[in-house]
Amino acid sequence: MANYRSTIRHRNSGSRKSVSGDTHEVTRVRTPQKDRNEVLATVLNLLGSKRVTLQCMDGVVRMGRIPGSKKKRMWIREGDIVIANPWEIQDSKADVTWKYTRPQVEWLERKGYLN
């Protein structure tokens, strides 16, 4: 049994790739769509319980909610750029629908989406 575990550990040890040295060109970036009422936002605070404080590009500070389907896949930290979808009923709240990676944020800055 010990031999089996050591071979698996040895076989999988080289499968990790370093992310820090990986520089690749961004070809397609999802942009906020006005017809879906989407807006770019920056995460100010993590409030806990799937809630964050967002500073939206339209000048409104909203409480954002991370839907349960995206909670495990989308790890959000302070300072991240996200797409928020404001609620129709309450304008002070929004759903977080997309999180940008670092190369995508650089692309958005170059193209003028972020002020």
Swiss-Prot record:
Q: Which HAMAP family match?
A: aIF_1A (MF_00216)
What are the start and end residues of every segment in region (Disordered)? 1-34
Sequence ranges assigned to domain S1-like in this UniProt record: 27-101
The identity of this protein, by name, is Translation initiation factor 1A 2
Biological source species: Methanosarcina barkeri (strain Fusaro / DSM 804)
Q: Which PANTHER family match?
A: EIF-1A
Taxonomic lineage per UniProt?
Archaea, Methanobacteriati, Methanobacteriota, Stenosarchaea group, Methanomicrobia
Q: What does this protein do?
A: Seems to be required for maximal rate of protein biosynthesis. Enhances ribosome dissociation into subunits and stabilizes the binding of the initiator Met-tRNA(I) to 40 S ribosomal subunits.
Q: Which UniProt keywords apply?
A: Initiation factor, Protein biosynthesis
This protein's source sits in the domain of life called Archaea
* Similarity comment text for this entry: Belongs to the eIF-1A family.
Bias class Basic and acidic residues marks the residues at: 22-34
GO molecular function (one): translation initiation factor activity
- Any Pfam family: eIF-1a
What gene is this protein translated from?
Answer: eif1a2
